[in-house]
Amino acid sequence: MQEIIIQVMNQFGYFGVAFLIMIENIFPPIPSEVILTFGGFMTTYSELGIIGMIIAATIGSVLGALILYFVGRLLSVERLEKLVSGRLGKVLRLKPEDITKAEKWFLKRGYATIFFCRFIPLIRSLISIPAGSAKMKLPSFLILTTLGTLIWNIVLVCLGAALGDNWEMIAGILDSYSSVVVVILGIIFILAILIFVKKRFFPKNKNYSSDTEK
């Protein structure tokens, strides 16, 4: 996949970057870190500039996020879970739990989630769906999405440009970072379930405790 990404970017320049980043938002398995860091490297040997690369990547990110936002407005979370539980989920490499996780992040943390989740693998794309389902105001969604993706794009493009031929090193580090984040999110999810079960089915009997003390 990396070779295809590089070919598209070399052939189509800014348009290729915008297109690939847009697809990356809709199809999470496509690695944005490869696109952005190689895009930064491209600025060292081609006519493409860092600012233009960042703008192209940000436009692609926002367009991809908008598509998922409107998908969320049209389809309920339950419907999306059913869709990804079948063949579509295998193609996109998504599970119903991924949709549920993104929804919980949004409902628990509110609008700020749209900004901060742009730095978290997988959820950075899926968080747009619950935002649409919750009928989040489009201007707010656009502002937070643009700011979050802009920062992410600036960092990776500049790193790619600074490292030059060693741009793949960043992609490798971020790939490990993605794996660690997914594991951490899984642990947090399991702990949340355990806490819920404990509070729901094993509540402390305060009355009994007070009676015993008397």
Curated annotation (Swiss-Prot):
It is a multi-pass membrane protein. The chain crosses the membrane at residues 48-68, 141-161, 177-197. GO terms for cellular component: plasma membrane. Pfam families: VTT_dom (PF09335). It comes from the Bacteria. Coiled coil: none annotated. It is found in: Cell membrane. This is Alkaline phosphatase-like protein. It comes from Lactococcus lactis subsp. lactis (strain IL1403). The lineage of its organism: Bacteria, Bacillati, Bacillota, Bacilli, Lactobacillales. The gene is apl.
